[in-house]
A protein has these predicted regions:
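Helix-loop-beta hinge of the Bergerat
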Residues: 11-44
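Conserved ATP-binding N-box helix of the HATPase_c
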Residues: 45-70
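Conserved beta-strand-loop-beta-strand hairpin that lines the nucleotide-binding pocket
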Residues: 1-18, 62-165
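Ordered, soluble secondary-structure elements with a strong preference for glycine-centered loop motifs
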Residues: 25, 46, 50, 97-102
Length: 165
């Protein structure tokens, strides 16, 4: 098992998992399943697990619709003490943006605590190749319920979370 603490401080560092899948509708359920599995291992309640599955499914479908050709969808999951951050992106043609209107966008805002989307490039996205090639990305954050806003602002969460069991 890998050590997930930093040597200098002894604090837990975020655990990160990266998936690259074709944007085919037959492959997107694998990403949804990974989101659900990670959320369960992090002790999210069952409603939050299902919310994450649905949010990831909607984000991936949205990105698949704006992706360029046969380029893969990249999804980076980062488990922290406070919750789960999911960054998903797909290469696009220059000038392509993520649609932020309609029912799908409203669903994303309802299911997670934070959602951001927009154009970027390979140099700035997690798991990117460092180039300036354009991508469309969606970032989702779902916090564990045990962390109140005051605890998050104070920076003093009360427990570590690991995705390993």
């Amino acid at each position: 098992m890998a050590d997930t603490t930093t040597a200098a401080t002894g604090e837990r560092r975020p655990e990160r998992l990266e998936l690259r899948v074709p944007t085919s509708p037959t492959q997107l359920p694998a990403v949804r399943a990974m989101a659900g599995d990670l959320a369960m291992r992090m002790d999210f309640d069952l409603d939050a697990v299902e919310d994450l599955r649905l949010a990831v499914d909607e984000a991936c479908a949205t990105l698949a619709a704006v992706g360029q050709g046969d380029e893969p969808l990249t999804v980076v999951f980062e488990a922290t003490r406070e919750g789960l951050r999911i960054d998903a992106w797909v290469p696009t043609a220059a000038g392509v943006d993520v649609p932020r209107d309609g029912f799908g966008w409203a669903v994303l805002h309802t299911l997670v605590d934070t959602v951001e989307a927009g154009p970027s490039n390979q140099a700035t996205v997690p798991g990117g190749n460092g180039s300036t090639a354009p991508v469309a990305c969606i970032a989702l954050v779902k916090r564990l319920r045990r962390y109140s806003a005051s605890e998050l602002l104070a920076g003093q969460p009360d427990a570590d979370v690991s995705v390993a069991r």
